[in-house]
Amino acid sequence: MNNTISELAASIRSIPDYPKPGIIFRDITTLLGNPRAFRRAVDELVQPYAGTKIDKIAGMEARGFILGGAVAHQLSSGFVPIRKKGKLPHETVRIAYSLEYGVDEMEMHRDAVQPGEKVILVDDLIATGGTAVGATRLLRQIGAEVVGACFVIDLPDLGGRRKLEELGVVVHTLVEFSGH
């Protein structure tokens, strides 16, 4: 692990038994509160796409908004929020997606992305991949080209990265933590 990645990993707080026993919650608010770590994380998320024309960054609610906005700014791209059902005021497109314990829905404004636009998904963490797979399908449903997905944290034991890659999405992550 290089120094930057080690620093990023050290800036993420681990909270055992949250939100339930046996889960270790990876809290990036400590990374976001550290100006140096936040800057480095955004720089590392942007790096694979430097020099590439990316039309939009799609951030998933809620921490994906923070990171996605910063990535969009650095890449001079537009930003698109992907939200939980019922949170957007204009005409939307919606998709149901699977979670570890059920089904949920997400949506985005119908006119936020045009067919053929190149989009990168951004979120803080990929675990089972349900949200990221749902967002990929939602974007493709309106004709976007999902050219990549980037996350600060990967929990590889839960298989989310593999699910996205099976959909042909190139995945870029910064820090891996084992377990749940």
From Swiss-Prot:
It comes from the Bacteria. Catalyzes a salvage reaction resulting in the formation of AMP, that is energically less costly than de novo synthesis. One of its GO terms (cellular component) is cytoplasm. It holds the Pfam family Pribosyltran. Its main location: cytoplasm. GO terms for molecular function: adenine binding; adenine phosphoribosyltransferase activity; AMP binding. HAMAP family: Aden_phosphoribosyltr. Its EC number is 2.4.2.7. The gene is apt. Transmembrane segments: none annotated. NCBIfam families: apt, PRK02304.1-3, PRK02304.1-5. Pathway: Purine metabolism; AMP biosynthesis via salvage pathway; AMP from adenine: step 1/1. Gene3D superfamilies: 3.40.50.2020. SUPFAM superfamilies: PRTase-like. Homodimer. Belongs to the purine/pyrimidine phosphoribosyltransferase family. It is found in: Cytoplasm. Keywords: Cytoplasm, Glycosyltransferase, Purine salvage, Transferase. One of its GO terms (biological process) is adenine salvage. This is Adenine phosphoribosyltransferase. It catalyses: AMP + diphosphate = 5-phospho-alpha-D-ribose 1-diphosphate + adenine.
